[in-house]
């Protein structure tokens, strides 16, 4: 039986190390700007994708300009007024300015949200989950539940990893296709909503890392004694530290995955 004990006892420690490593790595990458997240991917977006969609957007801007005129003016002889013409021209100017400023605006949003999230994380004194000191009885209990803890740690770590990295990929796509969305401004009601939708999505995806950082800090402050009497936990032989760490990991993974939904429901963006 000794080989079983020696084989299962490190599983709890392995789960703790996997979770802390993946969470620290994901937070470090998630709080960085897309430019520093992957310089090669950002170079592809900045040098190829963005100019490509910008060229298409310049053509689409002219098309939506004529569509906007046709939609706002039913009878050119009777309905074409100076006010209508000025309104459409202002939209064209804004669209042209926006097409050439999408990258600057995106970089500004990325830097603001990344800096804010980093400040929140540094001031929150986040350290990850702790293994704690185990006596002989607790070590035996942790040996039994070590497999379950390791599985929970791997699943939660994978959820956080996929969520944060998919968010970063979406930020690259948002910066690239931004000119197409902005070119819809002169299209009139309905079509011009694409520009607003792009801005809302950019803000949601960018600000979600701030919500994630705050949520992780809040969850790390939880303790089982907040929900159960301390005497009850000390009198019953329970792997309290293991249960608390599993609770923190599952709640953190759920919060990271639901950050976008929280932003949409709370701020309507």
State each model region's role:
Residues 183-200, 262-269:
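Alpha-helical transmembrane segments
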Residues 39-51, 75-88, 138, 142, ...:
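Membrane-helix interfacial "entry" motifs
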Residues 67, 87, 163, 167, ...:
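Short alpha-helical basic/polar micro-motif
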Residues 1-11, 83-99, 195-206:
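Alpha-helical transmembrane segments and their helix-start/interface "positive-inside/aromatic belt" motifs
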Residues 4, 8, 94-182, 212, ...:
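Non-cytosolic segments of integral membrane proteins
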Residues 204-209, 213-214:
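Surface-exposed substrate-engagement region within the catalytic domains
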Residues 60-96, 177-192:
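Hydrophobic transmembrane alpha-helix segments characteristic of membrane transport
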Residues 1-60:
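Binding/recognition "hotspot" determinant
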């Amino acid at each position: 039986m000794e080989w079983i004990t020696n084989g299962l006892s490190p599983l709890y420690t392995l789960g703790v190390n996997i979770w802390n490593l993946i969470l620290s790595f994901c937070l470090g990458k998630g709080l960085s700007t897309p430019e520093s997240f992957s310089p090669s991917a950002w170079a592809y977006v900045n040098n190829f994708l963005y100019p490509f969609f910008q060229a298409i957007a310049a053509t689409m801007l002219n098309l939506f300009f004529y569509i906007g005129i046709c939609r706002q003016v039913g009878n050119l002889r009777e309905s074409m007024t100076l006010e209508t013409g000025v309104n459409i021209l202002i939209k064209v100017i804004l669209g042209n300015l926006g097409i050439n400023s999408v990258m600057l605006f995106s970089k500004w949003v990325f830097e603001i949200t990344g800096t804010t999230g980093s400040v929140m994380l540094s001031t929150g004194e986040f350290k990850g989950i702790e293994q704690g000191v185990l006596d002989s009885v607790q070590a035996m209990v942790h040996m039994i539940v070590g497999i379950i803890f390791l599985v929970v740690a791997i699943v939660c770590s994978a959820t956080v990893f996929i969520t944060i990295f998919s968010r970063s990929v979406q930020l690259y796509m948002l910066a690239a296709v931004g000119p197409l969305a902005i070119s819809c401004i002169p299209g009139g009601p309905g079509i011009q909503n694409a520009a607003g939708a792009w801005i809302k999505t950019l803000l949601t995806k960018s600000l979600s890392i701030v919500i994630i950082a705050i949520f992780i800090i809040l969850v790390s402050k939880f303790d089982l004694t907040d929900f159960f009497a301390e005497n009850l936990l000390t009198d019953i032989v329970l792997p309290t530290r293991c249960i608390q760490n599993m609770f923190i990991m599952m709640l953190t993974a759920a919060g990271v995955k639901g950050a976008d939904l929280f932003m949409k429901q709370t701020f309507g963006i």
